[in-house]
Design a protein with these regions (language model features):
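Short, flexible loop/turn segments with low-complexity composition
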Residues: 45-49, 260-264, 311-313
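PAPS-dependent sulfotransferase catalytic domain
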Residues: 101-104, 109-126, 130, 144-309
Length: 313
């Protein structure tokens, strides 16, 4: 049995044990799956922390204030960012239920441009770079939904490039989906991702990734305009959907439409591990799931104990 088969087997047994309420056995197999993944796709948390520090140092308030002079005036893009398993797919289903919005899915656009932009230093902030990135991205979005007023991109890892995206599109809407860190980490730990994705799925590596992610998104909150960087708490969205959804739709510059309250009726294709959930009405079953696994959290427990994480009830 090769590594991919062992990974699928452990995740399948873990899921079956979770369904039966045997959380100790489930965690045993989820941990085993994580070990298989780490053996084949290692992740360097120290290098990621250094990259995070560099992005924070480069994306100053003064640079972000230059966006109107550097970027496109087009307001088409709606970028839904956050950690994987934080509710980004649900948010896309909600927003793209609006008749004037097209669903772009997870677009691998900004990662390549972001790497070039970041490595080029000062040269990356020149207007021609932003203009070409904006024009290329708009071509991608228009190919997906030619007549839509807004088009979503729910690639969660775009949280890395929020500064670049704002420079290219100062009128774009960035929606940051936040969810309890332990619930998110547990869901990541239990999910099969693409085998080439160099992303931690458990243990101290995932905790370190979370902390770098939160440092970076804390920075975006400080340096990006509050009306362009919108934050949504998953727990609030599932507890009182309508006021949260109304705020999101207004932030996108759209008139209200009741279809946004029924995302399960949205026929758009979902090609992520969240596909099944998006076919259900908005529910709270995934809130505070981590409590079932509390005795077996291991390093993930520090996400509760680090003084920053609210424990949902």
């Amino acid at each position: 049995m090769d590594a991919a088969q062992r990974l699928r087997l452990h995740l399948a047994i873990g899921k079956a044990a979770d369904d039966l309420g045997d959380y100790a056995l489930a965690m045993q197999h989820f941990d085993a799956a994580d070990w298989v993944r780490r053996s084949s796709t290692p992740f360097d948390p120290a290098a990621f922390a250094i990259e995070t520090d560099s992005l924070i140092a480069s994306c100053t308030p003064e640079l972000m204030a230059c966006a109107p002079q550097l970027g496109s005036s087009d307001a088409t893009p709606v970028l839904i960012i956050g950690m994987p398993r934080s509710g980004t797919t649900l948010l896309q289903q909600i927003v793209s239920s609006h008749p004037e919005v097209g669903a772009g899915g997870e677009l691998n656009f900004w990662n390549d441009r972001g790497a070039v932009w970041h490595s080029s230093g000062a040269a990356g902030i020149e207007k021609p770079f932003q203009a070409k990135a904006a024009a290329d991205y708009l071509r991608v979005l228009r190919a997906i939904a030619p007549r839509a007023a807004r088009v979503t991109d729910k690639m969660p890892f775009n949280f890395l490039w929020a500064g670049l995206i704002h420079l290219a599109f100062p009128r774009a809407t960035l929606i940051h989906c936040r969810r309890n860190a332990v619930d998110t980490a547990l869901s990541i730990h239990q999910t099969q991702f693409h085998p080439t994705l160099a992303f931690p799925t458990g243990g101290a590596e995932l905790v370190a990734y979370f902390r770098s992610y939160r440092r970076l998104t804390d920075h975006w909150r400080k340096v990006l305009p509050a009306d362009r960087f919108i934050e949504v708490e998953y727990e609030d969205l599932t507890r009182t959907p309508e006021p949260v959804i109304r705020r999101i739709i207004a932030a996108c510059g759209l008139e209200w439409n009741d279809a946004c309250l029924r995302p399960e009726r949205n026929p758009g294709a979902v090609k992520t591990p969240s596909k099944w959930q998006t076919r259900q009405p908005i529910y709270r079953n995934s809130v505070a799931r981590w409590r079932r696994y509390e005795p077996w959290l291991g390093p993930l427990r520090s996400l509760v104990e680090d003084g920053r994480e609210k424990s949902p009830t």
